[in-house]
Amino acid sequence: MDANFEMPPVGGMNDDDDMDFGDGASFLKVGEEKEIQQGLKKKLLKEGEGYETPENGDEVEVHYTGTLLDGTKFDSSRDRATPFKFTLGQGQVIKGWDIGIKTMKKGENAVFTIPAELAYGESGSPPTIPANATLQFDVELLKWDSVKDICKDGGVFKKILAVGEKWENPKDLDEVLVKFEAKLEDGTVVGKSDGVEFTVKDGHFCPALTKAVKTMKKGEKVLLTVKPQYGFGEKGKPASAGEGAVPPNATLEINLELVSWKTVSEVTDDNKVVKKVLKEGDGYERPNEGAVVKVKLIGKLQDGTVFLKKGHGENEEPFEFKTDEEQVVDGLDRAVMKMKKGEVALVTIDPEYAFGSNESQQELAVVPPNSTVTYEVDLLTFDKERESWDMNTEEKIEAASKKKEEGNSKFKGGKYSLASKRYEKAVKFIEYDTSFSEEEKKQAKALKVACNLNDAACKLKLKDYKQAEKLCTKVLELESTNVKALYRRAQAYMELSDLDLAEFDVKKALEIDPNNREVKLEQKRLKEKMKEFNKKEAKFYGNMFAKLSKE
């Protein structure tokens, strides 16, 4: 699943893990639909190979597209061109998946209609899936493999001695706490710890530990058989205090327990805002943009100097702010929107997302220029901004209008990125208008045109010319003679060096409004740019022919 969408389990391990649902569902004809159980339906689109189906514990690999019943797509591995992998029957996905995919053969393609009680139930999975939603998944089962050979090359075999809790596994950035004892095949102890903490990607002792912990759950105990390439290879390891030497090319046996771990995640794609969970929160909901949050905060410099402390004093009220309103530094704003209620996290923020290159006087100390800062954040409560599915049609139009006005205000203040977000949110409120009255559809259309046009202006300011072009095209699909859309798309085309397309839009705009001053100025700028381009092209071909004639 992608970074913004989670497929959490509903109710943990399945009660139906030992039951067989394959008799009917595995022998459907193409185009036939049948109920498997509890309202879960399967429709066969393409037959698979052979007769085998995956079992609990198998690691399956699928492509899927998930939609609501109205056709709204909320997630797709196909769009990412990356198959989705999970372990069947371990509660890593919704219950409907664990049941349904056990009925599939390799290469089979089917559509599963999954009722809410086998999906996300009454809570849904905001912001993409409403409460009590019946879902449809178009799933293709690509393959499945045994999980025992964890590196798929015979280098590390894993035998589970004690099953772990829940369904999560540590990731590369996480800090794990493990106990282990490593022996040679003759029983000689060559490594041992009753509790060592390390970052997964940095590893500890030998490469096999990193490989293994990424497949383990909290509290899981395993026996690893480790070949030399994941141990100490051709060089081996010299003896140390209380531990024997590892000879060259030795196979190891390691008893390993994953005691716990602290989840560390990248809040931003550039790894400049990182969040480490110190205490897990409750549920799956997180604050959205525009949510009102209440937190306890401690802000520190890298040397430990405390520059901010909120909500920790006796009888002191929690610190309250509204997300996505620049009321706190950008990195903190983004991190809080990744937290759950009750979660305590340590957020490390590079200067770019904190106070930048300027000195900043804070409550308890000065933050010097270009400072990396940390915040310990305790998210106490939050009130989310209402989502579109919680509104009737009148409220959706009203909310879209409000977001448009907020966007206009941000634009006038030169805050183009924030303005763009407001316009995008406005359009989302009214994107699906099938339930609108005719009058409401007219209002929604006018709002879509205005917001997409204004958003295009933001994208031009932000130099995101490709997105500006796409937004103008959306407007022209609604109003083919919209001069502003033609004008702004021409600007985008010029910056993208698509001069012929820019010329077409300018000419069309002037046909509609011959006296438009802005378009005329753009036409003049376009002619100058085309003249400059033609000169460069002539020079290029002149030099090329000169070289050819010399040869």
Curated annotation (Swiss-Prot):
Modified residues (N-acetylmethionine): M1
TPR repeat placement: 400-433, 449-482, 483-516
Cellular component terms (Gene Ontology): cytoplasm; nucleus
Source organism of this protein record: Arabidopsis thaliana (Mouse-ear cress)
Catalytic activity annotation: [protein]-peptidylproline (omega=180) = [protein]-peptidylproline (omega=0)
Induction: By wounding, NaCl and by heat shock.
Gene for this chain: FKBP62
Function: PPIases accelerate the folding of proteins. It catalyzes the cis-trans isomerization of proline imidic peptide bonds in oligopeptides. Co-chaperone that positively modulates thermotolerance by interacting with HSP90.1 and increasing the HSFA2-mediated accumulation of chaperones of the small-HSPs family.
InterPro entries: FKBP4/5/8-like, PPIase_dom_sf, PPIase_FKBP_dom, TPR-like_helical_dom_sf, TPR_rpt
Region Disordered, residue ranges: 1-24
EC annotation from Swiss-Prot or TrEMBL: 5.2.1.8
Family: Belongs to the FKBP-type PPIase family.
GO MF, one annotated term: calmodulin binding
Protein name: Peptidyl-prolyl cis-trans isomerase FKBP62
Region (Calmodulin-binding) location: 529-545
Pfam families for the chain: FKBP_C, TPR_1
